[in-house]
Amino acid sequence: MENSKVIVPPIKCQGIKTKIVPFIKEKVERNTDGVWIEPFVGTGVVAFNMAPQKAILCDKNQYIIALYQGIQNGTITNQIVREFLEFHGEKLEQQGASYYKEMRDKFNQNGDPLHFLFLNRSDFNGMIRFNRHGQFNVPFCQKPNRFAKAYVTKIYNQVANVASIMKGKDWTFRCCPWQEAFDGATENDYIYLDPPYIGRDTSYVGEWPEDEAIQLAEYAHSTPANVCLSMWKENGFRRNDHLFGHWSDFIWYEQDHFYHIGAKESNRHPMIEVLAIKR
């Protein structure tokens, strides 16, 4: 794989850092003997592109963790994924929304990571959202032919790519509160932080209140490990006061990018993203 190629993971998520991965790789300097730690691994896009030899990758979403554990230990292969998506994709094409709801109901009963992947790749906008009872509740994307051959092959290749990256590496995936990811971190380690937006009900991890965001800043300042925070600075409507109030002593590197609300070009808005790196 070429260093310039951005590895895209099989899981989709709003706010995924795919577009700024080259920026992160350019700015982050780490001790390759240390451990790469992510308390909010999400889709895993940053970890898969940094490709450290040692990593502790944590998230409160047990289904993401289970999927990557399965790929890592070989119980979920790209061929298994292909056969699963082809089989259920054919039924989806025949039955549409009713079959999507059937698969969603099954997932809410069994929590199977392959069902989670199916839903994630056929729901509305790649959203990951659970209700207060822990049930996945994102609606169908209204595309019965979602799992066309080319799309399944794309996911097949994504699973193969991340499996190849993990092979021979000392990676641990953990479903746990973010605080536990800091335990035992040393000055040789590197902690990458991509927390949720303050005040937003992030749904797959629960609400992210301001007091917890402040606690994260305190942990980041007190840990002996190196730290890099990825966070939005400002857009055309407002600025991130939390970033200015609690991370101003870090070194900031900025990059402009765009985010979309809906499909229209007029809904394309500029955003300044900051990598705040501990001095």
PLM features: residue spans?
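Short, solvent-exposed loop/turn segments at secondary-structure junctions
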Residues: 43-46, 62-64, 122-125, 178-181, ...
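Conserved S-adenosyl-L-methionine
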Residues: 20-21, 27, 31-89
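A residue-level signal for conserved active-site and pocket-lining positions in enzyme catalytic cores
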Residues: 42, 68, 117, 227, ...
